[in-house]
Amino acid sequence: RSGNAETLDRHAKPHWELAEEMDLIDFELGAKVTGAGFPFYKGKGAKLQRGLIQFFLQKADEAGYTEYIPPLMINAESGFGTGQLPDKEGQMYHVTADDLYLIPTAEVPATNIFRDVLLQENDLPKTLTAYTPCFRREAGSYGAHVRGLNRLHQFDKVEILRVEHPSKSYEALDGMVEHVKSILEELKLPYRILKLCTGDLGFTSALTYDFEVFST
């Protein structure tokens, strides 16, 4: 499925060229200060980033999601609780002195709110949203030569999460897909939705849809 294809300029410049020309993002400065995959957002680029985060959070609030600001680090028990450990341990930043991990997505601490908690059916659904910086090592050769904002080691993300009765889980997923679609439609961004094949599914996933938004 796709949408807003009519807004796509076939001769559009890559986003990294636009970011440089408009002085929105400085990739070289990030590489100097930290390393590749840690860009600086500046001026209007920083304002745009902050504005989009607030826009996404506001849309989630209007849809009934409760906002959380979770910790940016988790313990090993939380990593195992959502399947990041041991499956993706090599992709996570590990602070060995304290045996804590930087989160790869807000989903991890948000989901662990309900770890070891017995929920009654009439307590459901639980709907959460959270904005956090996210950290991923992206170890290995895959994505090593991509440019711009792809495969970053640090990036910002607004997450939506629903805890549902198993019999309603796929229906809930469809509702979340429609929520994201409505935001992209409002922003008039060209996008497509991919249903991942079994071999590409995450360790803990039964069904995954990827949204791809045009950026060249």
What do the predicted segments below correspond to?
Residues 4-216:
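TRNA-recognition modules of translation machinery and tRNA-sensing kinases, especially anticodon-binding
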